[in-house]
Amino acid sequence: MKIAVIGQSLFGQEVYCHLRKEGHEVVGVFTVPDKDGKADPLGLEAEKDGVPVFKYSRWRAKGQALPDVVAKYQALGAELNVLPFCSQFIPMEIISAPRHGSIIYHPSLLPRHRGASAINWTLIHGDKKGGFSIFWADDGLDTGDLLLQKECEVLPDDTVSTLYNRFLFPEGIKGMVQAVRLIAEGKAPRLPQPEEGATYEGIQKKETAKINWDQPAEAIHNWIRGNDKVPGAWTEACEQKLTFFNSTLNTSGLVPEGDALPIPGAHRPGVVTKAGLILFGNDDKMLLVKNIQLEDGKMILASNFFKGAASSVLELTEAELVTAEAVRSVWQRILPKVLEVEDSTDFFKSGAASVDVVRLVEEVKELCDGLELENEDVYMASTFGDFIQLLVRKLRGDDEEGECSIDYVEMAVNKRTVRMPHQLFIGGEFVDAEGAKTSETINPTDGSVICQVSLAQVTDVDKAVAAAKDAFENGRWGKISARDRGRLMYRLADLMEQHQEELATIEALDAGAVYTLALKTHVGMSIQTFRYFAGWCDKIQGSTIPINQARPNRNLTLTRKEPVGVCGIIIPWNYPLMMLSWKTAACLAAGNTVVIKPAQVTPLTALKFAELTLKAGIPKGVVNVLPGSGSLVGQRLSDHPDVRKIGFTGSTEVGKHIMKSCAISNVKKVSLELGGKSPLIIFADCDLNKAVQMGMSSVFFNKGENCIAAGRLFVEDSIHDEFVRRVVEEVRKMKVGNPLDRDTDHGPQNHHAHLVKLMEYCQHGVKEGATLVCGGNQVPRPGFFFEPTVFTDVEDHMFIAKEESFGPVMIISRFADGDLDAVLSRANATEFGLASGVFTRDINKALYVSDKLQAGTVFVNTYNKTDVAAPFGGFKQSGFGKDLGEAALNEYLRVKTVTFEY
């Protein structure tokens, strides 16, 4: 058909393009005149195609159609007029001229909401159903016969923009094309509009959009969302006109803490909170507004209403200045009437419209590859200077999400100044615990107090879980792409690397870790872990599955891997940062949010990590850190109904209790890495030098505070005495001392209670008849130092043969030469199964032993060789679930099956 398109906007442009793709001939386009030198998108598109474009400011004069306009229209020979979006009054001489007449798109379910602000009134009235109508134009106001209608559900927090973008725009384009197709096929109906239910409302303007506070909260919410963006619902407060945007109903019934905002005429003062502005209806129910436009036109976060201009002005680098000038050129192209774009140039006051916002965002994103920029950012920073500041903060990963006031504890140590946060980290802020509760964290090197650390209470856990839940369900974390999530994790790993000396120093101070080992392992492997899982973010995928078809129809079945939600991670004290990283990296890569409970005795690197997440741009609430006791914080996380997964590393006894709590509370998913008594079998045909070296490492690595430490060494009889002699010789060479000294081999045990348990453990071994070859006592110096210890003649029934020391205690037992199956039986005669090892030159023996050992990891001619890509986790009462490797992702994902029939 020959079609004349009459209208404007991106919607009109899309309808025009789709009609041409359908094979229709668009003989002419009638649109609005250029505004401030900018042509409407519909006209621009048609001009590119060589289609005649007419830009009339009016079609009539004194109630009569302009003859020249009518003549030019009639010369086109159109068979149908299509009006996808038209703000002008078109004379009936034009409307009725074509053979098929004219069809009009209207964004409501006619006869309801006739008039120019139909979408606004759909929301203002709280309609549960919305949609659009395509009708045959007549001489009435939206009263013509219906050709086609489509409806959708109106969501409780829909705004004009969300409803338009989700349904009215994409489905409306399809609807217009379908309507034209029906006309071309001679199948288009003409259904008279019913009079029942017909309404007409006037156009919404700024002067009519003032909020009436004497109505329920839901009605106020509907008024605000119905006027969202244009014209904007407003009120007077603080001696200025405030316009509210982005409203949601608050159904929790709890009024958050905040600052009162008196509003004349309101039932109660508003409350400015961290989440936004709480408003009240006359029914005492609440709604939350997230954005406020001030009288000068500046848009701010409602939560910042009383903060003023809180952000300092950034000094731009040379590269950033180049980017700023490139962005200035983009502004100049969009704002041709502005002679020179200056820092004070306001995008909207210079004539920009909403379509220009889209163009600006897309051009800047193309200019700055990987940038996360949304339309809302332009409204929040409408002057060029503010926009550049916002842009640079985002590019640095130091935007608003990263701004936080931190009360540091500073110490001059290890030839540097370390700065350590010491408060709880909840919702992106460092805060005191409920009741200002604190506990001391102790330096195990000398027993001195490092600082007071906030001690989380049950109410703090609830706040942290609520922050994590909100970040997961409503925050930016769940909206960004998986690739962008990976980019943030890479940035976090880079920051950890930049701060690795500081992190390693804190590990030495707080946990007694030998500094050189902390650099390589505690911190180094943590960095590797985040980089490894950052790479997995955009590779988490489901599969398609062939199933039996429901003949004569067909089926398609697919699976999706989804994050589980809020996760609680409870970490031990032996590797404070590394254990955090092993679990948290996989958890975040899967798209979850997290509440981390570090061990009460070693909280400081976890809190430093929290600070780095802010600097990396991880959105607020995604990561929360709660130092505190296991009986309070760990228990509440296990019991909390909004926590969907617990990852725990610690003792078997506590792991059993956590598993029970997870089952009783809400059957939450759980993974447990628990105790161990890992056997290491050393055969006579081994490389003895290597066996001694690795045997030492298997026990004394990280002062023996190592979950996979070899809890018992089985040495073949013919090399037993020589092995023991060499081990004792090496032990006597070990330097026990300050973990910050570069030549120290062996630092202090983690805390005093653990030191006491080690002494009791050794006393137990001596009482039962084991031979104490060396060590077994506290080192006579300040701090929690324990001598590297070696026991021999350990029999299977003894306490030290069965129980884990979790310290620098080597337990050696003999086995008869060639008695392979007997030693395997003894090695497996434990309820633990975390790790194991074997030293032999015989590959057949190595393979046989690795098959038979009942442990999650078997080391052959090595020990402690973990890697971020290799799954880690135990069997039996050493727990279940995996850290590291691809397998770890499954601990933090759920699989959904979706089946289609067609």
UniProtKB/Swiss-Prot annotation:
SUPFAM superfamilies: ACP-like, ALDH-like, FMT C-terminal domain-like, Formyltransferase
UniProt subcellular location: Cytoplasm, Cytosol
Site positions (Essential for catalytic activity): 142
UniProt modified residues of type N6-succinyllysine: 38, 660, 767
One Gene Ontology cellular component: cytosol
Domain (Carrier) ranges: 318-395
Record-listed NADP(+) binding positions: 571-573, 597-600, 630-635, 650-651, 673-674, 757, 804-806
PROSITE patterns: ALDEHYDE_DEHYDR_CYS (PS00070), ALDEHYDE_DEHYDR_GLU (PS00687), CARRIER (PS50075), GART (PS00373)
GO biological process, one term: tetrahydrofolate interconversion
Domain notes: The N-terminal hydrolase domain has an NADP-independent formyltetrahydrofolate hydrolase activity, releasing formate and tetrahydrofolate.
Family label: In the N-terminal section; belongs to the GART family. In the C-terminal section; belongs to the aldehyde dehydrogenase family. ALDH1L subfamily.
Task of the protein: Cytosolic 10-formyltetrahydrofolate dehydrogenase that catalyzes the NADP(+)-dependent conversion of 10-formyltetrahydrofolate to tetrahydrofolate and carbon dioxide. May also have an NADP(+)-dependent aldehyde dehydrogenase activity towards formaldehyde, acetaldehyde, propionaldehyde, and benzaldehyde.
Protein name: Cytosolic 10-formyltetrahydrofolate dehydrogenase
Classification lineage: Eukaryota, Metazoa, Chordata, Craniata, Vertebrata
